[in-house]
């Protein structure tokens, strides 16, 4: 959540930074008007309360000195009535402003270039040269069917479209990749964590998936049958996680972390679940875009002054992991129009897929600054014993299915067989 004080006191700066995202002008105008109304009502209520306090003090003094108090009492009664009217108005406006703030995206920082969509992203550098094949490289779904690694029809039979079944070396390779990724991340200083994959609503509010992206989530409605506190049959909203970013970040929700425990560097493997509501017609073949997929995530909680350096550490970790697998890739700085909701800046890592003859995203490393920490109330106690918001960062290291795709396409032979990267062989 953006800083409401900044929204109210320096709206022009907020609007200028959000302009990088090409938000609709009507939405920003609504935010400006609501912030103005709240600020005016809040100021009026504070002035009335100050006047009430002053006159209450005077009332006590007059009464003690035996002075006439009837007119002063009448003024206090009027102030009391006015405050009883305005304070609920302030509360309503505050709730409306907080609700609006929950759907306002993060402010892009100075690293984020101006641009409307992915075509305006800026390539930073390329790592490893793509292999030149002396035959037409096949796409991963062709190789999967030929080798019996992935069964698409059976995935649909078991669930629906965008589900699949890994078999034989495909299943073993996926398991090997998960173990290798976790070991690699651990070697770079990230603590391995195992978290739930089902979470409550508050957890998703903390990292920003709710309320704006509820349609992208798989929701579970649990009814508690046993009587709890005299309430029977109470419903409880639960969701399947779209990424381990959600659970790793919210581990510290509503907590104050000692400054000497920062930075916290965490990694976890989880299955992830997404409805992909806005992806109809995109990547309908293969396993690039699935409703259920495995991912190994990196999350960091840091002091504000350390977050840029930690973001670079995370970028290097994911890039070096790809390099260790011999997979060509490039780093791309996302423009404002392509930036995720919670990110202040993002570097995408895109892996080369020779079968598709293009680079495809395999990791996004984002610095959210204090956006998520403010929503989730994750703070740390600094050296002066003051509570401050941490910065949170997240990124994949890596998306397992897409890494499997990249290995299949980059390590294929002319006869359709697939070599195994050397670093994975001890895991198989």
Swiss-Prot record:
InterPro entries named in the record: aa-tRNA-synt_IIb (IPR002314), aa-tRNA-synth_II (IPR006195), aa-tRNA-synth_II/BPL/LPL (IPR045864), Ser-tRNA-ligase_type_1 (IPR002317), Ser-tRNA-synth_1_N (IPR015866), SerRS_1_N_sf (IPR042103), SerRS_core (IPR033729), tRNA-bd_arm (IPR010978)
One GO term (biological process): seryl-tRNA aminoacylation
Pathway stated in the Swiss-Prot or TrEMBL entry: Aminoacyl-tRNA biosynthesis; selenocysteinyl-tRNA(Sec) biosynthesis; L-seryl-tRNA(Sec) from L-serine and tRNA(Sec): step 1/1
Organism: Wolinella succinogenes (strain ATCC 29543 / DSM 1740 / CCUG 13145 / JCM 31913 / LMG 7466 / NCTC 11488 / FDC 602W)
Residues that, per the record, bind L-serine: 243-245, 297, 396
Keyword field contains Secreted: no
Sequence positions that bind ATP: 274-276, 361-364
SUPFAM superfamilies for this protein: Class II aaRS and biotin synthetases (SSF55681), tRNA-binding arm (SSF46589)
Enzyme class: ligase
UniProt cross-references to Pfam families, sorted A to Z: Seryl_tRNA_N, tRNA-synt_2b
Reactions this protein catalyses: tRNA(Ser) + L-serine + ATP = L-seryl-tRNA(Ser) + AMP + diphosphate + H(+); tRNA(Sec) + L-serine + ATP = L-seryl-tRNA(Sec) + AMP + diphosphate + H(+)
Entry note about domains: Consists of two distinct domains, a catalytic core and a N-terminal extension that is involved in tRNA binding.
NCBIfam families assigned to the protein according to its UniProt record, in alphabetical order: serS
Lineage, opening ranks: Bacteria, Pseudomonadati, Campylobacterota, Epsilonproteobacteria, Campylobacterales
EC code(s) of this entry: 6.1.1.11
Subunit structure: Homodimer. The tRNA molecule binds across the dimer.
Family label: Belongs to the class-II aminoacyl-tRNA synthetase family. Type-1 seryl-tRNA synthetase subfamily.
HAMAP family: Ser_tRNA_synth_type1
Electron transport among keywords: no
Gene Ontology CC entries for this record: cytoplasm
Functional note: Catalyzes the attachment of serine to tRNA(Ser). Is also able to aminoacylate tRNA(Sec) with serine, to form the misacylated tRNA L-seryl-tRNA(Sec), which will be further converted into selenocysteinyl-tRNA(Sec).
UniProt protein name: Serine--tRNA ligase
Compartments where located: Cytoplasm
Keywords: Aminoacyl-tRNA synthetase, ATP-binding, Cytoplasm, Ligase, Nucleotide-binding, Protein biosynthesis
Domain of life: Bacteria
GO MF annotation list: ATP binding; serine-tRNA ligase activity
């Amino acid at each position: 959540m953006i800083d409401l004080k900044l929204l109210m006191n320096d709206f022009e700066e907020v609007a200028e930074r959000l302009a990088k995202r090409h938000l609709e002008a009507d939405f920003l105008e609504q935010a400006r008007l609501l912030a103005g109304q709240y600020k005016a009502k809040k100021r009026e209520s504070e002035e009335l309360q100050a006047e009430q306090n002053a006159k209450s003090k005077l009332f006590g003094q007059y009464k003690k000195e035996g002075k006439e108090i009837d007119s002063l009492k009448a003024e206090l009664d009027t102030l009391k009535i006015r405050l009883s009217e305005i304070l609920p108005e302030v509360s309503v406006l505050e709730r409306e402003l907080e609700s609006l703030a929950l759907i306002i995206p993060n402010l892009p920082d100075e690293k984020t270039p101006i641009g409307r969509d992915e075509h305006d992203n800026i390539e930073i550098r390329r790592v490893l040269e793509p292999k030149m094949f002396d035959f037409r490289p096949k796409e991963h779904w062709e190789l999967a069917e030929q080798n019996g690694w992935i069964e698409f029809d059976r995935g649909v039979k078991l669930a629906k479209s965008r589900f699949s079944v890994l078999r034989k070396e495909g299943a073993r390779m996926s398991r090997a990749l998960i173990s290798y990724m976790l070991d690699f991340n651990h070697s770079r200083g990230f603590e391995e964590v195992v978290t739930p994959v089902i979470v409550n609503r508050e957890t998703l509010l903390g990292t920003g998936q709710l309320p704006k992206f509820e349609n992208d989530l798989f929701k579970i409605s649990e009814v508690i049958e046993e009587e709890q506190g005299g309430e029977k049959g109470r419903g409880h909203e639960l969701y399947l996680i779209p990424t381990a970013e959600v659970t790793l970040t919210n581990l510290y929700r509503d907590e104050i972390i000692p400054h000497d425990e920062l930075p916290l560097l965490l990694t976890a493997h989880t299955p992830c679940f997404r409805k992909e509501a806005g992806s109809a017609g995109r990547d309908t073949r293969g396993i690039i875009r699935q409703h259920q997929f495995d991912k190994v995530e990196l999350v960091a909680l840091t002091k504000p002054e350390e977050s840029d350096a930690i973001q670079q550490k995370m970028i290097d970790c994911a890039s070096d992991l790809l390099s260790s697998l011999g997979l060509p890739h490039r780093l791309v700085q996302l423009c404002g129009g392509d930036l995720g909701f919670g990110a202040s800046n993002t570097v995408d890592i895109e892996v080369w897929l020779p079968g598709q003859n293009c680079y495809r995203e395999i990791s996004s490393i984002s610095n959210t600054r204090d956006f998520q920490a403010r929503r989730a109330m994750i703070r740390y106690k600094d050296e002066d014993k003051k509570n401050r918001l941490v910065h949170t960062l997240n990124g994949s290291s890596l998306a397992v299915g897409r890494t499997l795709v990249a290995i299949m396409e980059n390590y294929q032979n002319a006869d359709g067989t697939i070599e195994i990267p050397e670093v994975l062989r001890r895991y198989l």
